[in-house]
A protein has these predicted regions:
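Glycine-rich beta-strand-centered segment in the early N-terminal region that forms part
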Residues: 1-27
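Short helix-loop-beta connector
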Residues: 15, 48-51, 74-85, 149-150
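Hydrophobic beta-strand signal
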Residues: 21-22, 87, 155, 176
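A structural motif shared across PLP-dependent enzymes of the aminotransferase-like
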Residues: 27-40
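Short, glycine/polar-rich helix-capping loops at beta-to-alpha or helix-loop-helix junctions
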Residues: 31-32, 115-123, 183-186
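Mid-domain Rossmann-like dinucleotide-binding core that forms the NAD(H)/NADP(H) cofactor-binding site
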Residues: 56-137
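Glycine-rich cofactor phosphate-binding loops and adjacent beta1-alpha1 units
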Residues: 77-81, 127, 131-199
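C-terminal hydrophobic helical "lid"/dimerization subdomain
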Residues: 211-255
Length: 255
């Protein structure tokens, strides 16, 4: 989250002084800089109700969730809500927190999250999860207890074996993974005609894809959901001031 200090002659929609947000491009330095140069197509006006620190907590996780749920899974949209069932594996993390909120905004179906500790389960419920299952226990019996025959979409931050997921995903369902895995047996998915996708929200800016401007439009939609109080920031700690010591402190806290 930042303020526009200068804009190129071909930039449309932004002026000096605009309060904006973006997640940047990992091939372009500037994360810890006072100023950074960014492609205007991956930027939008930030929600006026948020502080700059609160706004900074959302773009990366919210864009990852948007691309996973809307671009890949096609769970629904803010304008056309569905009734599909969604599971977030790893619900208490940054992406999980954003994905639960976004899912509640685009589907009327069950939004279930996995968690293993009471405090993280409570966090997921605070984010809007309609059900919690323990990922340290067998998943299928817990899913059956909710009366869910299969999830239309699953977003996974900690992907379990394919055979485990094949039991709980609906035919023609969609799995999106944001983690890395050494091996994944796709044959377990064949009988249900399932789709598997990996997700990195940096792909569009990194490779300058023809639809790179979708990222700016997604951020504008996310900002609208924030103003409608359907998505809230997930910041739990604020270290004030851009100094070398604070950068080290914040990095250590994340690690």
């Amino acid at each position: 989250a930042s303020v526009v200090r200068a804009a190129g002659s071909e930039v449309n929609g932004f002026s000096v002084g605009d309060e904006v947000w973006h997640s940047g491009n990992r091939d372009r330095p500037g994360t810890y800089s006072q100023f950074t140069l960014v492609d205007s197509r991956i930027v939008s006006k930030r929600p006026p109700s948020l502080s700059i620190a609160e706004a900074a907590s959302l773009p990366l996780t919210a864009l990852t969730s948007w691309e996973a749920l809307i671009d890949h899974i096609r769970l629904g949209t803010p304008e056309e809500r569905s009734n599909k069932a969604f599971l977030m594996i790893g619900g208490a993390g940054g992406v999980g927190s954003a994905a639960i909120q976004l899912a509640r905004a685009i589907t009327s179906g069950p939004v279930v999250a996995t968690s293993s500790r009471p405090e993280s389960a409570q966090w997921c419920q605070d984010m809007g999860a309609t059900g919690i299952i323990n990922h340290r226990e067998p998943l299928a019996p817990q899913v059956n207890d909710f009366g869910i025959t299969g999830f239309d979409g699953i977003l996974s931050a900690y992907t379990p074996p394919a055979s485990t997921l094949a039991e709980i995903i609906a035919p023609f369902g969609h799995l999106v993974m944001i983690d890395g895995t050494d091996s994944f047996d796709l044959m377990a998915f064949k009988s249900k005609s399932l789709t598997v996708t990996s997700e990195s929200m940096f792909s569009r800016p990194q490779f300058a894809t023809p639809d790179v401007a979708e990222q700016g439009r997604a951020l504008a939609s996310i900002a609208d959901l924030v103003e409608k109080r359907q998505i809230r920031p997930t910041m739990t700690r604020h270290i004030e001031g851009l100094t070398a010591q604070h950068v080290r402190e914040a990095t250590a806290a994340v690690e």
